[in-house]
Amino acid sequence: MPDIIIEAFQKAFELIFSGNHEVFATVYRSLYVSGLGTLLACLWSIPIAIILGLYSFKGKWIIKGVFNALIGVPTVALGLLLYLLLSKSGEFGFLGLLYTVNGIAVGEALLLTPIIVSFTSSALEAADVQLRDLAKTLGASSLRTNLTIMRETVWSLALAITAAFNRGFGELGIAMIVGVNIFQETRVLTTSIAVFTNLGQFDIAMAYGIILMIIVIAVTLVVNLIEKIKRDEIPEKHSVRDWILVMWR
């Protein structure tokens, strides 16, 4: 087992630094699908989260409970539902999204919606308790109070979006069922891992897995670093040691 892991790391760096066109095309395709899916999800998830997080109405907790439950929806079940809807005989077959990267992105947008809604609405509610009374004491209007709460939770939103992107980036079921893993068309990192594993080429499969993990970790670290910079946790005159200490906290 250790030999396989070592060979996988060697293969991963070979694939990265060899300039292999298919590897970079697969990585780009994965980033495109996850990025577009996350962007689409944000378009409707953020307004829903604001309504759930800042306003009270009947049935609110039922709706929140549904979104919380949908975080754990099996991706293969969602992929199957999308396949039926996007097929030629389905209600949305006229869109021509089946077997395309855009179709996968739409599926991922639906998958990521509960994550963004649940995380963001919870952050807004937590901030609401702390800030609303203070804002009213200072004479702020309801609109200004809500804007203040949203401003205070912007980094919670950023982390929710990052978590959603990472979830989509590592998703397999929708990509496999809706995109069917067409070579140079809909093949992404996760489906590549599945294919090479089935072929018994474990070193290449693990290499793709390592590349996937490197990208996910890098995206998360960059977002965390930007958050710390914006919060002035990194001094103006900083050294490499300062950066390491800040990232370690």
Predicted regions located by residue number:
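Periplasmic/extracellular loop-to-transmembrane helix junction in inner-membrane transport proteins
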Residues: 1-38, 55-57, 149, 198-201
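Membrane-interfacial helix termini and adjacent extracytoplasmic/periplasmic loops
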Residues: 2-14, 18-21, 78-109, 178-182
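Interhelical loop and adjacent transmembrane-helix boundary motif
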Residues: 18, 178-225
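Alpha-helical transmembrane segments of multi-pass membrane proteins
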Residues: 29-37, 67-70, 143, 147-159, ...
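Transmembrane-helix boundary motif in ABC transporter permease subunits
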Residues: 36-67, 142, 149, 222-225
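Cytoplasmic-entry segments and transmembrane alpha-helices of multi-pass inner-membrane transporters
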Residues: 48-82, 238-249
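C-terminal transmembrane helix and the adjacent membrane-cytosol boundary/short C-terminal tail
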Residues: 114, 121-131, 136, 144-148, ...
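Transmembrane alpha-helices
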Residues: 119-120, 142-174, 228
